[in-house]
């Protein structure tokens, strides 16, 4: 019995070591590109509020679909800032389904657009219907939203099986 437990524990340790090594090397089952956009967001601690917002808005199927999208994903700090800016709590924002849906779909472009392919100084139509514009300001790519607010793109080309995610430092707001 003791020998069997030792063998079992050795097998678990070996499996864990191989899994850890593959994850550290970026190898294995290419889990990043096998994830859909929603899974990618849900598995990133810095995007947890966005994941909760997607669930609250009832948009999980959109972010899991086979349709390709580009998501400008606001990080958690961006949500904290926009709640203060709007004078709302997270619960109030999440309860306002039309506003939440409009804000989230304003962060989506149809199709997969990698960082290098983003068009500068050109209005880009979002899934929500309004446009946003990407500019290069002093060497930093920024997005100007429908209320003339700017957001920096701080992380790029997080690949998902149904598109790509670029992390931004502000929640983008559509025009009023």
Question: Where does each model-flagged region fall?
Answer:
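Mature, structured domains of secreted/extracytosolic soluble proteins
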Residues: 2-13, 18-176
